[in-house]
Amino acid sequence: PKDVKGTKMLTHTHKKGDDDQWLFLPSLRRVKRISSRSKTSSFMGSEFSYEDLGSQEIDKYHFKWIKNIKSKKGDTHYILERRPKQKSGYSKMLMTISKKMMSAIKIDYYDRKGDLLKTGVFGNFKQYKVGDKKIYRASLIEMKNIQTKKASVFTWKSRKLGVKHRSRDFNKK
C-alpha cells in the first residue's frame, strides 16, 4: 500500500534475550522502537507479527526432530518441532526444512492454546555469500491465518546480510 511504501525495519539480533527492533515510517518521518511486549502484535495490520520478522536464532528454541520426507521432486525435507525458550506468541512451530538449502520452506505456527494459527510458505529463494558461507534466504513469504482466513505476502526487494556497521552509523533520537 502507498501509505507504507518505503517502510524499513532494523533488527539488532541477540543470541539470547529479545532482539532490538526499530521501524522507520516514511509517512511520519520518524523511527519507532518496537518494544519486546509488542513482538506478538501484527506488523502493520498484516498476518505477520514482529516476532515472525525478528531473528530466528537457534539458541532461542528447543528443537525436536519429527521425521524426514521426500518432496514430489525427490528432495529431502526435515520436519522439526520448534518450541520457544522465552515468552512467545506461539506454543510451538512445525517447520519443514529443505535439506538442499538448509532453510525453512514452510512453518505451521500454533497459538498459546496449541491450536494451528497460521502457516507461512517461503519462496523465491536467493543465495547470499556471508563471509565464506553461502546461505539461502526466501525473498517471499505468504502467511495464511487459518483461524481468520486472511492472508498477507511479504517480499524483499533488497536484502543485505553480514553487513558491518559502526556505532556512529546510527543515532538515537
How would you name each of these model-derived features?
Residues P1-P26:
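N-terminal mature ectodomain segment of secretory-pathway/periplasmic proteins
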Residues I58-N68:
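Surface-exposed, charged, gly/pro-rich loop-and-adjacent secondary-structure segments at domain edges
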Residues L10, D20, R30, I34, ...:
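Gly/Pro-enriched, hydrophobic low-complexity segments
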